[in-house]
Curated annotation (Swiss-Prot):
Zn(2+) binds at residues 86, 102, 109. It comes from the Archaea. Its main location: cytoplasm. It is an enzyme of class 3 (hydrolase). The gene is hisI. Belongs to the PRA-CH family. Its cofactor is Mg(2+); Zn(2+). This is Phosphoribosyl-AMP cyclohydrolase. It catalyses: 1-(5-phospho-beta-D-ribosyl)-5'-AMP + H2O = 1-(5-phospho-beta-D-ribosyl)-5-[(5-phospho-beta-D-ribosylamino)methylideneamino]imidazole-4-carboxamide. InterPro entries: PRA-CH (IPR026660), PRib_AMP_CycHydrolase_dom (IPR002496), PRib_AMP_CycHydrolase_sf (IPR038019).
Length: 138
């Protein structure tokens, strides 16, 4: 678990404002392989809860609320380290990913690549769960 000795929120620049919420960009990366799993936003509360619990929390810009990654699916991210960029407006969460990071069922949200004028599923993309079994048909 990540231990914080103080309020790291004052060290960061929550300068990305979406719908009145001050946010930082958060990149989740597999702590062993370096694979980029997902990109999301964090507000101050999401960062605080992440540091206190050792599990990734994010701010949903579409739902306008805090969410624990994996709260519906069980596919949580255990945070091993937090890196901060030079401007203090983005973090990389080095995580141990349980199951898939992407709501589409893939291990990573970055399962497609650009091929000419098309998006193609990468040959090495790994689908680890069926989203309909977890989320229903929506």
């Amino acid at each position: 678990m990540i231990k914080s000795k103080g309020d790291v929120n004052i060290l960061l620049n929550f300068r990305h404002n979406i719908n009145g919420e001050d946010l930082i960009i958060a990149v989740a990366q597999d702590h062993e392989t370096g694979e980029v799993l997902m990109v999301a936003y964090m507000n101050r509360e999401a960062l605080r809860r992440t540091l206190e619990t050792g599990t990734a929390h994010y701010w949903s810009t579409s739902r306008g609320k805090l969410w624990l990654k994996g709260e519906s699916s069980g596919h949580v991210q255990r945070v091993k380290d937090v890196l901060v960029d030079c401007d203090g407006d983005a973090v990389v969460l080095k995580v141990e990913q349980e199951g898939g990071a992407c709501h589409t069922g893939y291990r990573s949200c970055f399962y497609r690549s650009i091929d000419g004028d098309e998006l193609k599923v990468r040959e090495d993309a790994v689908k680890v769960f069926d989203p309909e079994e977890i989320y229903g048909d929506g």
